[in-house]
Amino acid sequence: MAKAKFERNKPHCNIGTIGHVDHGKTSLTAAITKVLAEAGGATFTAYDQIDKAPEEKARGITISTSHVEYETPNRHYAHVDCPGHADYVKNMITGAAQMDGAILVVSAADGPMPQTREHILLARQVGVPAIVVFLNKCDMVDDPELLELVEMEVRELLSKYEFPGDDIPIIKGSALAALEDSDAKLGKEAVLELMKAVDAYIPQPERPVDQPFLMPVEDVFSISGRGTVVTGRVERGIVKVGEEIEIVGIRETQKTTVTGVEMFRKLLDQGQAGDNIGALLRGTKREDVERGQVLCKPGSVKPHTKFKAEAYILTKEEGGRHTPFFTNYRPQFYFRTTDVTGVVHLPAGTEMVMPGDNVAMEVHLIVPIAMEEKLRFAIREGGRTVGAGVVASIIE
C-alpha cells in the first residue's frame, strides 16, 4: 500500500498523553484514533499496536515511544504515548518528542496518584505550555459527588504546579466505552469533546522560522580577502544579508554585521531555520568567535552561568555512571555544540543522586552560555553522556 501523502494544509501541533500508570493513557490514545477515524481524520491504531512502542535513541538515551497522527477539522496532530513511567521522564527531559501541549489522563476511580503529580511537575519543569484533562473510567463511578471531588483534587494539583487549575478544561468520559462503542455519551462524544478542548485550549506553537534568529557556532574559518566565516545550522528565525547580529556566550557579547550568507557554496540573501549556512561577518577576527557561542538577533538571548534544571541520570545499563553523585559534582554540560564545566548543587534533603534517578538541581557554569528556559543539554564525563537535562529557570 502506498504511503498517504502528508498534507500540510492545516496547522501542526505536537501533543502527548501523560498521567499515572494504568489510568488509561494508551486506551485513550487508541480511542482518539478510533473516533477520529470515523470522521476520516485518522487511521485507527489499536491498543496493542500503541503499547509495543519501538525503542528510539535520543542523545544516547534509549526511550520507548509510540507515535500516532490524526487530524481534527482545525489541526493536524502528532501524538506521543509512552509505555513506562521512566520513558515519560526521559522523553520530557530530553525533548525527544516535543510537546506543545499534553492530555493528562486521570482515572476517576482512583483520583490523582504519585505519577499524576510527577508528570504535572515534569510538565512544569520542562515548559509544556498547556494541559487539558481527561477524567477516564467515569463509567466505573456511580456517584456524581465523587466525580466532582476528583475533579477538584486534579484542579488543586494543577494549580499547585502553577498551571491555571481553575480554567483548565476537564472532560469526563471513558476510553473503553469509546473503544467498545458501549456508551456514546461517555465514549465517542466525550472523545470528540476532548479534541474540541485540545483544539481550543492548547495554543498553536510559533513556527521556528517566525522566532528570533539564532544559530549555534559549529566552525570558524578565515577567508583571505573576505573575512571570517562562521558555519552552523540555523536553529530558528531568519538572517538576512546586511543585518546586525550578536555573538553571545563564553566571552563578552559582541555586535557585528552579516555581510554574506552561503549555502552549498552558493551565495544567498538569507538563511532560515533548518539551513546549514556559512555567515560572513564584517570586521570580526577568527579568534573573536569560537564553537559553543551563538549568533543571534540582538537582545534576544543573554549569556548565563547559574540556572535551575531538571535532569535524568542514565543507568549503568544505558552506559551511564555506576555510582551515585553528590552535591559539588563537576561534570561537563554540553549545550548545543560545546562542553562547559559546571558545579551541581543538589536541593536540600537530596543526599545523593543514583543512576536512573531524575532530579531538580542547580548548576553553576564556569563560563556563561547563551541560554533560555526549555534549552536542552547533555551531562557528560570525558565525552561520555551520563545524563540529560533541561533548563527549568534561570538564576543569573
Swiss-Prot record:
Location(s), subcellular: Cytoplasm
E.C. number: 3.6.5.3
Transmembrane domains' residue ranges: none
Residue segments, region G4: 136-139
Pfam families the record matches: GTP_EFTU (PF00009), GTP_EFTU_D2 (PF03144), GTP_EFTU_D3 (PF03143)
Cellular component GO terms held in the UniProt record: cytosol
Entry keyword set: Cytoplasm, Elongation factor, GTP-binding, Hydrolase, Magnesium, Metal-binding, Nucleotide-binding, Protein biosynthesis
Region (G3) residue spans: 81-84
Subunit architecture: Monomer.
Protein name listed in UniProt: Elongation factor Tu
Protein species of origin: Nitrobacter winogradskyi (strain ATCC 25391 / DSM 10237 / CIP 104748 / NCIMB 11846 / Nb-255)
